[in-house]
């Protein structure tokens, strides 16, 4: 790469969150940084976009550095769409999202605004990485993450794969730097949330609910999964894509004779 890369930074915890500030500082070492991020927390919004509602985007300066910054009233995906179409001087060389406060491993990826932002970038043909730290604390320590964040982003910037867009989901264990054992390339663990709703009543007797639940890892001892890597002190990297086609079932379905099925139901 001959020119200085343009790096788009976003997140779902909001533009003032410590995680994105740590990411911005790291990315300033690697290129020209443009931050377009939500003006308030947007955790768990997934791939939602703003429709039938006005979208605001204002230039701001959150802290020191050479980065240019905008805060957006919409979702993380809104931020990426708006940045690419209306804010950046050209298509970014990479989009990075995070560093999220909390895990986006395994099934959590389906709900994540952090990961949805990089999926949106990949739809536009932009290499992208979502970073998450397994620490929900607002004052989480992001220092141990910075070395690995820079290393991963540099690898993508300077080692492109022809005809392929790299999109990665990276999760970092809550450990001191010297305790992190390294990086594991993994698959997404089979998991789910066993959820319930805590039913309550407000002072006027109106019913309301709090979502609660327990995380269930269905691949508990599978060493090739992101959950195993994180549990055992490794950073997990899972390559992801927006194509949700189930190719295993695809060929089976092609063998079905739908005309015969149609005739059968007409005759019954």
Question: What do these predicted regions represent?
Answer:
Residues 2-3, 7-10, 18-86, 90-91:
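A cross-family phosphate/adenosyl-ligand binding-site feature
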Residues 34-36, 70, 129-131, 168-170, ...:
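Hydrophobic/aromatic beta-strand patches that form the interior of the parallel beta-sheet core
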Residues 83-89, 116-127:
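Alpha-helix C-terminal capping segments
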Residues 94:
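Short, Asp-centered acidic motifs that coordinate Mg2+ and/or phosphate
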Residues 103-112:
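Glycine/threonine-rich flexible loop motifs
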Residues 122-144:
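Glycine-rich phosphate/pyrophosphate-binding loops
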Residues 143-261:
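Electrostatically charged, flexible surface regions
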Residues 265-266:
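Short hydrophobic targeting helices and cationic amphipathic motifs
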């Amino acid at each position: 790469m001959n020119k200085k890369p343009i790096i788009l930074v976003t997140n779902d915890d909001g533009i003032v969150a410590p995680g994105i500030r740590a990411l911005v500082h790291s990315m300033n070492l690697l290129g020209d940084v443009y931050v377009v991020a939500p003006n308030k927390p947007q955790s768990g919004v997934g791939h939602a976009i703003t429709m039938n509602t006005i979208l605001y985007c204002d230039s701001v300066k959150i802290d020191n550095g050479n980065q240019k910054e905008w805060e957006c009233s919409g979702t993380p995906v809104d931020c990426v769409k708006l940045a690419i179409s209306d804010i950046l001087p050209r298509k970014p060389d990479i989009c990075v999202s995070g560093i999220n406060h909390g895990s986006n491993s395994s099934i959590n990826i389906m709900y994540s605004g952090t990961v949805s932002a990089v999926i949106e970038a990949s739809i536009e043909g932009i290499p992208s990485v979502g970073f998450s730290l397994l620490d929900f604390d607002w004052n989480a320590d992001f220092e141990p993450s910075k070395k690995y964040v820079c290393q991963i982003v540099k690898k993508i910037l300077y080692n492109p794969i022809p005809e392929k867009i790299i999109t990665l989901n990276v999760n970092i264990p809550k450990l001191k730097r010297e305790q992190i054992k390294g990086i594991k390339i993994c698959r997404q663990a089979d998991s789910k949330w066993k959820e319930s709703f805590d039913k309550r009543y407000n002072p006027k007797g109106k019913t309301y609910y709090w979502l609660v639940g327990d995380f269930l890892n269905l691949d508990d001892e599978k060493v090739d999964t992101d959950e195993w890597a994180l549990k055992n002190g490794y950073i997990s990297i899972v390559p992801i894509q927006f194509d949700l086609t189930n190719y295993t079932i695809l060929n089976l379905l092609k063998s079905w004779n739908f005309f015969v099925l149609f005739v059968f139901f007409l005759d019954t």
